[in-house]
Each structure stands twice: as structure tokens, then as C-alpha cells.
Curated annotation (Swiss-Prot):
Entry similarity comment: Belongs to the universal ribosomal protein uL14 family.
Keyword Transmembrane carried by entry: no
Molecular function (Gene Ontology), one example: large ribosomal subunit rRNA binding
Gene Ontology terms describing biological process: translation
Gene source species: Escherichia coli O6:K15:H31 (strain 536 / UPEC)
Alphabetically ordered keywords of this record: Ribonucleoprotein, Ribosomal protein, RNA-binding, rRNA-binding
Keyword RNA-binding listed: yes
SMART domains: Ribosomal_L14
Entry superkingdom: Bacteria
Entry protein name: Large ribosomal subunit protein uL14
Binding partners and assembly: Part of the 50S ribosomal subunit. Forms a cluster with proteins L3 and L19. In the 70S ribosome, L14 and L19 interact and together make contacts with the 16S rRNA in bridges B5 and B8.
């Protein structure tokens, strides 16, 4: 569950390390975002010479949460941290060329097939 002011790790090689959620998109009073949801973030920590810099405002997709994802069979998949993959603001394609760590099968929609194909493991 991601809400405003939540700090997330970045699971790609775009150059950002830590980001902070500034808005959960999708509805006027929507409070929480889960895996597969698009949020609005600002970059709080970035590496030198990366594709993005500190202070940039972007729209990533959430790929891992501490809260986890409940499957129809009743199982829950939880992770040790909250992570996201940064997307291009207009094309909604990933900025990075590599994805680090596992992602869940819930991302298998037409919009995020590129992330699924780049990920080393799909749970």
C-alpha cells in the first residue's frame, strides 16, 4: 500500500535510487496504490550521470509492496520493500533498460509487457 509521502526504491537502471510518492493517480480522493498502479513521484536520491536527476517529477508503476498482493487462490505475495519502475511521462514505457528484482504477474497487461520481459523473475 503506497500513499502520499511514502519512500520507494527504484527497481531499474534509470539513475534514481530513492523516490517519494506525491500523488496516487486514479480518482479524486484515492488514498492507496498497490502493485500495478501508476503514481506520481519526485526523485529524492539519484546517481551522477543518470538518465534522471534529483527533483524530477515522473509517473512510475509500482512493482513491489510490503503489503503484498492477494491472489484468487488465497495466497499472498509480499516483499521486503516498496519498489517502482520509472516510466516516460508521455509514452508510459520504462526509462531504464534493465529491471532489478522480481515482479508480480499482476503487471501482465498490455501497458506493462515491456517490464515483464525485462524482469529477471516473474512471481
Amino acid at each position: 500500500m503506497i500513499q502520499e509521502q511514502t519512500m520507494l526504491n527504484v527497481a531499474d537502471n534509470s539513475g534514481a535510487r530513492r523516490v517519494m510518492c506525491i500523488k496516487v493517480l486514479g480518482g479524486s480522493h484515492r488514498r492507496y496504490a498497490g502493485v500495478g498502479d501508476i503514481i506520481k513521484i519526485t526523485i529524492k536520491e539519484a546517481i551522477p550521470r543518470g538518465k534522471v536527476k534529483k527533483g524530477d517529477v515522473l509517473k512510475p508503476v509500482v512493482v513491489r509492496t510490503n503489503k503484498g498482493v492477494r491472489r484468487p487462490d488465497g495466497s499472498v505475495i509480499r516483499f521486503d520493500g516498496n519498489a517502482c519502475v520509472l516510466l516516460n511521462n508521455n509514452s508510459e514505457q520504462p526509462i531504464g533498460t534493465r529491471i532489478f528484482g522480481p515482479v508480480t504477474r499482476e503487471l501482465r497487461s498490455e501497458k506493462f509487457m515491456k517490464i515483464i520481459s525485462l524482469a529477471p523473475e516473474v512471481l
